[in-house]
Amino acid sequence: MLYCVQFGRRVIRLVSATVHGFFLTLLAMFKPKVTLRYPHEKGPLSTRFRGEHALRRYESGEERCIACKLCEAICPAQAITIEAEERSDGSRRTTRYDIDMTKCIYCGFCQEACPVDAIVEGPNFEYSTETREELMYNKEKLLANGDIWEEALRYRIKKNQPYY
């Protein structure tokens, strides 16, 4: 008799749990969907989102980087390589500015360390490649990225929304 009572309680618990699960599923079916169909729909990005790197220019077209190498020194992943030379007017400019995006951890230290806001992490997060070599960004690629995003970066500065 005791065995039948225990068996009955187990059956009741099992049926109760199953009905509860079905009820939760039924409730979820009528809630609004929160899933985005990614390639066609994109969610909002934070104003402080850190994406693909870029080098900025002054409005005159001259690159901002003064080759102080603070970004290279502060990078915990050692992803940045800079070579510089002195110009005839005494100022220093970069001859080589490389970022290995396979090493980068997107911490934002490089743009925080930059005294002239030359290096930034822009809003682009869709930069997949077919080879690892394409993730080695040189100075020309970084300057091209900066030219593409300059309007978005200016807007953030105007709205007093820093990019880190």
UniProtKB/Swiss-Prot annotation:
Primary site of residence: membrane
SUPFAM superfamilies tied to this protein: 4Fe-4S ferredoxins
Subcellular location per the Swiss-Prot or TrEMBL entry: Cell inner membrane
Amino-acid positions noted as binding [4Fe-4S] cluster 2 in the UniProt annotation, renumbered to this chain: C75, C104, C107, C110
Chain positions recorded as [4Fe-4S] cluster 1 binding sites: C65, C68, C71, C114
UniProt-recorded Gene Ontology molecular function terms: 4 iron, 4 sulfur cluster binding; iron ion binding; NADH:ubiquinone reductase (non-electrogenic) activity; quinone binding
Required cofactor(s): [4Fe-4S] cluster
Cofactor note: Binds 2 [4Fe-4S] clusters per subunit.
GO cellular component, one term: plasma membrane
Entry EC no(s): 7.1.1.-
Membrane topology value: Peripheral membrane protein
Family membership noted in the UniProt record: Belongs to the complex I 23 kDa subunit family.
Subunit structure as annotated in this protein's UniProt entry: NDH-1 is composed of 14 different subunits. Subunits NuoA, H, J, K, L, M, N constitute the membrane sector of the complex.
NCBIfam families xrefs: NuoI, PRK05888.1-4, PRK05888.1-5
Protein name: NADH-quinone oxidoreductase subunit I
Organism for this UniProt entry: Anaplasma phagocytophilum (strain HZ)
